[in-house]
Each structure stands twice: as C-alpha cells, then as structure tokens.
Swiss-Prot record:
This is Guanine nucleotide-binding protein subunit beta-5. Widely expressed. One of its GO terms (biological process) is dark adaptation. It holds the Pfam family WD40_Gbeta. Keywords: Disease variant, Intellectual disability, Membrane, Repeat, Transducer, WD repeat. It comes from Homo sapiens (Human).
Length: 395
C-alpha cells in the first residue's frame, strides 16, 4: 500500500531512479521515501497490480472496522440505566391534545415550529404546505407544490421564510409576508437540486444556508441566495431519510440516518463523516440531537429508539418493549433532555425516561400512523403530524 501526502515538493535525488528531480514524500509500508512524480506513479500502479485489488482493500477495511469495534467494547464498562439508579423517578405525567389542526387532504408527512413558539409549518401528500397559528388553529399561508408527497419542510430561523420539497427532487424557499393575499408561488426560489427525492431539510443558524437530505444517498449544504452547492456529504449506502443540526454552541456538525441502518455525524466544513453508528436492524427514520449536543437519539423501523453518546463513541441506551412491534417514525427530546417523545406506526406516541430507559406514558389520539413530531422551541408543548390528515398540539 502507498499513501501520498500533500506536502510541498523539494528538489533532490529520487530514492527509486536516483535522478535529481523535484521530489514528493511517499509512504510505503509506513516508511517515508522521496520519489519523483514518475516513479511515484509507477509504484502506485505496481502496488495496485500486485496486491491492492478491490477485494483485498475491502478485507483490510473490514479488519480495521473489527479492531475499532474491539476498542469500543473495551470502553463499554457501564450502562446508562445503572448510572441513573440514584436519580429520582419522574412524577405523574399528564399530557393531552390541546389543539387539532385540520386542513390537509391527505397524509401529513412533516412539520416544523417557528422560533416564535406559535406558528407551525406542515407538508402533506396532498401537495400542500400550510402555515398555521397553533394558538387559534387558523391557517395563515398555504402553498400548492407542483408535486404530491411534500416530504420535507422547515421554518427559517428568522420566521420570514419556509423551505419545502419532496418528489420534485428539489428544495424550494418561499418568503412569508404579512399580505395574505400575495401570491407566494411567484416568489418561490429553487435552492437545492438532487437526483432523487428530497427527504429532509433544515436551515442552519441563519436564513442564508440550508441542509438537505435525499433519496440519492447524499446530504448537501446550499447557499439560499445563489442556490450554489457549498458542500456535499457522501457516505450513506442507501437513501438518507433524516437529518438534524447540532445545537449552535456545539459546532458545525449534523447527524443523518437512512435506509442503510447507519447514523452518521458529519463535519459541515470538511464534508467528512467524523462518527458512524450501525446498531439498528432496519431503516433509521428520525434522528435528533440531545439539547446539550453531546448525544443524539434515533428512531427506526426495527421498533426501537436508541441513544448514542458522541463522547463515549457508542450506543448507551435502547428504548423498546416486547409489546412494541411497529417502527418508530419520529423522535424528539424535551427541553431538559429528560424525556424522549417517539411517534410510532401503531398510531401512538410513547414518552420515555431518557436516563432510566423506562416508558412513562403512552399518548393516544391519532387515527393513523404518527409520521412527524417536534417539541416547541420553549418546551411547553409538542406537535405531532399523522397519516390521519391532522396535526395535534399536546401540552
């Protein structure tokens, strides 16, 4: 094997042909050599012909992966519920539906809160994107998309725009105005273009950049104003279904999950995957950062939710019961991080004690599978969307 570095070339005698030429440092079996460009290319080609076949490289990758898992296992000396034994148990938990938002003509697929803690944007299989007043249940804006299955929507941090997309393979941004009679579609701005459906989108900490996830197996960071691709993220082996941006104070990272059963943490500046977790047994439908940014939760079609500690670099808790046989479609934390709300395909919302791993409540009300769920910015309520065409605000 050989690895080439990007150090500045120097002039001297080549260790291969011994001619005085511009040299580049090359590592061969961990030994540093100085080769001219011609010899370096010949050596790389010979190495590939001799033993660096695709099969051998895959074998080496699997070997390294096994060693990594062994090192992780050495650090696995305690479980979260054991540490939490001395933590006081939660008291009586009471939440119920306070508002029901009706207006979509088909399955609600996604929703997001505005930072003003009052307005909600939702998208549906009927091709509509609606902005709601969650206090009065009034519809403030409505947009008809050119395609059905609007699978992603997001509110801009300023509250002055929304983003949405789905089977049209692109992310569109609509500015919001006080004039409710204004034609919003005329001001539409197409920002992101993928080669397959758009599954999720999220503004960064400003209105100027947006993250997208797609069925083409990639995530991407875009400039909203110019529509320029700023960074692409490749690493998933199948459709990417969800993403979540880390809390602003923890740095430029985000987590994604997909049909390859992987949850991957990405550095937005370099475009590189910095951590990956593969403990789920089926598609990962939802990921959400813990409020501190030190961990994240995931919900999967394997009927479990899981908690991953980024500092320990491993899974630390599984939230499941034998009676739960349907997949988890959406997850989110309470503002304190003590509770994990999870929507399931059996029409229920389960509330989990994050520390103790126990279920503290089951919320009933939806008449079809729960497809999306988000806690309000102030933590006083959460909203769920369902295939029963409605959204419910719980408190």
């Amino acid at each position: 094997m050989c690895d080439q570095t990007f150090l500045v070339n120097v002039f001297g005698s080549c260790d291969k042909c011994f001619k005085q030429r511009a040299l580049r440092p090359v590592f061969k079996k961990s030994q540093q050599l100085s080769y001219c460009s011609t010899c370096a290319e010949i050596m790389a080609t010979e190495g590939l012909h001799e033993n660096e076949t695709l099969a051998s490289l895959k074998s080496e990758a699997e070997s390294l992966k096994g060693k990594l898992e062994e090192e992780r296992a050495k650090l696995h000396d305690v479980e979260l519920h054991q540490v939490a034994e001395r933590v006081e148990a939660l008291g009586q938990f009471v939440m119920k539906t306070r508002r029901t938002l009706k207006g979509h003509g088909n399955k609600v697929l996604c929703m997001d809160w505005c930072k003003d803690k009052r307005r909600i944007v939702s998208s549906s299989q009927d091709g509509k994107v609606i902005v709601w007043d969650s206090f009065t249940t009034n519809k403030e804006h409505a947009v008809t998309m050119p395609c059905t299955w609007v699978m992603a929507c997001a509110y801009a941090p300023s509250g002055c725009a929304i983003a949405c997309g789905g089977l049209d393979n692109k992310c569109s941004v609509y500015p919001l105005t006080f004039d409710k009679n204004e034609n919003m579609a005329a001001k539409k701005k197409s920002v992101a273009m993928h080669t397959n459906y758009l599954s999720a989108c999220s503004f960064t900490n400003s209105d100027m950049q947006i993250l997208t996830a797609s069925g083409d197996g990639t995530c991407a960071l875009w400039d909203v104003e110019s529509g320029q691709l700023l960074q692409s993220f490749h690493g998933h082996g199948a459709d990417v279904l969800c993403l979540d941006l880390a809390p602003s104070e923890t740095g430029n990272t985000f987590v994604s999950g997909g049909c390859d059963k992987k949850a991957m943490v990405w550095d937005m500046r370099s475009g590189q995957c910095v951590q990956a977790f593969e403990t789920h047994e089926s598609d990962i439908n939802s990921v959400r950062y813990y409020p501190s940014g030190d961990a994240f939760a995931s919900g999967s079609d394997d009927a479990t939710c899981r908690l991953y500690d980024l500092r320990a670099d491993r899974e630390v808790a599984i939230y499941s019961k034998e009676s739960i046989i349907f997949g988890a479609s959406s997850v989110d934390f309470s503002l304190s991080g003590r509770l994990l709300f999870a929507g399931y395909n059996d029409y229920t919302i389960n509330v989990w004690d994050v520390l103790k791993g126990s279920r503290v409540s089951i919320l009933f009300g939806h008449e079809n599978r729960v497809s999306t769920l988000r806690v309000s910015p102030d933590g006083t309520a959460f909203c769920s969307g369902s295939w029963d065409h409605t959204l419910r605000v719980w408190a």
